[in-house]
Amino acid sequence: MKIKLKQQNQDITIGVSDISEIKPLILRVMNSHHTGWSQLRQSFKCIQYGLSELIINAIEHGALGLGSDKKYRLKRNGTYEAYLNEKIRMMTHSILIECIESNTQIKVVIDDYGKGFDWKTALRIAETKQDGKGLCIAQNTFDELTFDENGSRCHAVCLKK
């Protein structure tokens, strides 16, 4: 799988073959704006966790098209991570992650080029069901969390102090 990073007028393509490579990728994105993150209300770790949830959701549900029922069945069987890593290695889709910093905010845009989802409903039911917990975490992490109409592009915004 390829992840395309757009940051500071640079386009970088990174090959990812394992879900464990996501955390270092997030650190790379965040470290490219090392001064900006320190000016935010949220902690570095909290933002890292929120971004991780959004990127993993983009991989699972957007790029791979993994449905919630199958995901939880794989988790119950203890085969989720192996399944996910196998699919990631075979995946031809890419995900775009763009980090945009201004005087007032840092915005991370994640585009999975998938079919999208009904994000308004998903955010509403996330508080009461197992489905959507990652979205609920992200919603509580960022000052603004929005999606395009079909739900395949996410905008996560952190305002500066």
How does the language model describe each region?
Residues D69-G132:
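Glycine-rich/acidic phosphate-handling loop/turn and adjacent ATP-lid/helix
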Residues M1-S20, T104-V108, K115-G116, T128, ...:
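Flexible, glycine-/charge-rich segments associated with ATP-binding catalytic modules
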Residues M1-S52, E60-R76:
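Bergerat-fold GHKL ATPase/HATPase_c domain
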